[in-house]
């Protein structure tokens, strides 16, 4: 614009009334402008032409005289309304639409010089020279700046480009404000009117545009919406009618092209109209059909969503996975007591103390005792751990909360810890109560440093804090059940969290008898059924397996059309569980059947003539499960420990099948049927050497991880295992050579009857004949 040391502030508010008062006041009298007394002589302090005052001092004097109100109010040109009406009107119209902040109005152009009507202003006696002199004093001048002692008196305004900042602005202001043109070729009033059209472009805008008036913003928005609403109907109307004339013209043109007589033109138009109406009716019918189809699909969709939400399984899953605050509902176990638990008397006795505490806590607290916080049930699968927990809740008649360890953690981080908090919060609100966590090892496993699962420890940490943290949980008993107690974290199984650890073993003969009686009372069975005989033949069966045995017998009796369950059905179900289901549809040729008969009879001969081997239960060449034959061995009594002789006898029995094939068919015709037998024998020999300390060379030292041992030690272990297997093979070969006749008779009996029990095997080995079935 000007030199960078100049200060230009063209936005000046000069009310029109002040200008008129200044014109009417005599020369030697004072004028009041905005409440400030200013002498006219002071206004007429004109600087000689050869020494133009600086723009800075003149503008400062101008501000002092006129008492400027505010800069940028949108009224900069209002004081000169009478001098140039048309440009001022346009400027006022542009400025009235702006708000109270600085908005740059659009520049306008003055095509002709403004005309002065002094008569309307009452200034007919004033001369043009006086008016020019007065306006010249009122307007800021542009001249060379003075030397200023303080830099605070100078305002530096950045131009719109680096070129203007460095070299100055070469626009019309520089030309009009030069000394020669400004003083000799134009008057001040004419110059300012000519420059007025460029001033809005150079108005300095201060402030933040984000603080615009909300009222004006809403008003402008509503105006734009109104304009859009006014434009839209006319646009749509024009869009719809844009081709109507052409359609009419095309119809007339069509009639002319077809040379339709004028007498038939009306009929043509009528037919065209009828066809058009029919097409519209067809279109309307199609639209109605589509509308009905959409409505039907929408209703079906709503019913489908409603049905999914009402589905119990889906609703529960949705309920438990949508949020962290899943509801916890207690279950009353009034129909389950300790009478339903059979075969685990020691475990029942331990838990009855807890039930007594829940029923009568004062009996224990009066002596200073505290309720145990946690009870850990440990045992193999199917021994009744969950049933014991339900019996505790049923006997104590308290709320029972059930949760599985795998239900806590999901795909979201923090869900497991949140559900632990919700579970214990609900339990504390309903204390005294029982919380049963099944499969505790899935949530309470040992914590490890793993970068792959950094958040997996949150759930167990929350469980530890809830069980024995800063806040006590009086009246809440936690019962946990697991099949792998060695996998639990040490902080979880310490006293204070799980105070009691109850082992739930497999039932013994007495326990199996009680369990069989309990489940037999639920079905119809013959009086000849002896539960003790079945119990002796089901060594190692758990409570769940015994329940399955009775259920399979009932199903077999129903299939055979019997009214009661007999021993035959119970034996059938026992063999089905021990040896697998029969595969009678399999067709086996005589050669393979003969090999199988001699193979299975070899196992039976070794088991029968070895002193410490388990007694034979049944032998069969009927395909069962993955095998072509099977010999079932059952101990007469429960075995709590096994001797070295018993382990060697098991190895000898396993070797009997391959030895029989070698002796009968030769080494070139041995089969792969002995692979599982060798696996079993190798496992027994390896445990004898590495765990049981039954090797004379290696002694009683155990070797848990053979991969970390020295090559010499590994070689010694392998040598000892090889010796045990070789000796077992030789013993089995000696027995079969000694009892070759009995071996042959038993194989022929198996080929004839397919299945033989223990008594029938004994009859055959004694040289007697079996009764015809």
Curated annotation (Swiss-Prot):
Q: How is it modified after translation?
A: Proteolytically processed by mitochondrial processing peptidase (MPP) to generate the mature form. Degraded in an OMA1-dependent manner in response to oxidative stress.
Q: Spell out the Pfam families in the cross-references.
A: AAA, AAA_lid_3, Peptidase_M41
Instruction: Report the enzyme's class at the first EC level.
Output: hydrolase
Q: Where does ATP bind?
A: 341, 383-387
PROSITE patterns in UniProt: AAA
Q: Which consequence is recorded for altering residue 439 to Q? A: Loss of ATPase and protease activity. Loss of PRELID1 degradation. Cannot restore OMA1 degradation in YME1L-depleted cells
Name the catalysed reactions. Answer: ATP + H2O = ADP + phosphate + H(+)
Which residues lie toward the Mitochondrial matrix compartment?
1-295
| Segments on the Mitochondrial intermembrane face | 317-773
SMART domains registered for this protein in UniProt: AAA (SM00382)
Tell me a GO cellular component.
membrane
According to the record, cofactor stoichiometry and binding are noted as:
Binds 1 zinc ion per subunit.
Q: Which GO terms describe its biological process?
A: cell population proliferation; cellular response to starvation; mitochondrial protein catabolic process; mitochondrial protein processing; mitochondrion organization; negative regulation of apoptotic process; neuronal stem cell population maintenance; positive regulation of mitochondrial fusion
Q: In which tissues is it expressed?
A: High expression in cardiac and skeletal muscle mitochondria.
Gene Ontology molecular function terms on file? ATP binding; ATP hydrolysis activity; ATP-dependent peptidase activity; metal ion binding; metalloendopeptidase activity
E.C. no: 3.4.24.-, 3.6.-.-
Positions binding Zn(2+) in this chain are 599, 603, 677
Which co-factor is required? Zn(2+)
Instruction: Give the residues annotated as active site.
Output: 600
Subcellular location per UniProt equals: Mitochondrion inner membrane; Mitochondrion
Q: Which InterPro entries match?
A: AAA+_ATPase, AAA_lid_3, ATPase_AAA_core, ATPase_AAA_CS, FtsH, P-loop_NTPase, Peptidase_M41, Peptidase_M41-like
Q: What disease does the Swiss-Prot or TrEMBL record associate with this chain?
A: Optic atrophy 11: An autosomal recessive disease characterized by progressive visual loss in association with optic atrophy. Atrophy of the optic disk indicates a deficiency in the number of nerve fibers which arise in the retina and converge to form the optic disk, optic nerve, optic chiasm and optic tracts. OPA11 patients also manifest delayed psychomotor development, intellectual disability, ataxia, and leukoencephalopathy on brain imaging.
Describe the function of this protein.
Answer: ATP-dependent metalloprotease that catalyzes the degradation of folded and unfolded proteins with a suitable degron sequence in the mitochondrial intermembrane region. Plays an important role in regulating mitochondrial morphology and function by cleaving OPA1 at position S2, giving rise to a form of OPA1 that promotes maintenance of normal mitochondrial structure and mitochondrial protein metabolism.
Q: Which family does it belong to?
A: In the N-terminal section; belongs to the AAA ATPase family. In the C-terminal section; belongs to the peptidase M41 family.
Q: What is this protein called?
A: ATP-dependent zinc metalloprotease YME1L1
Which organism is this protein's natural source? Homo sapiens (Human)
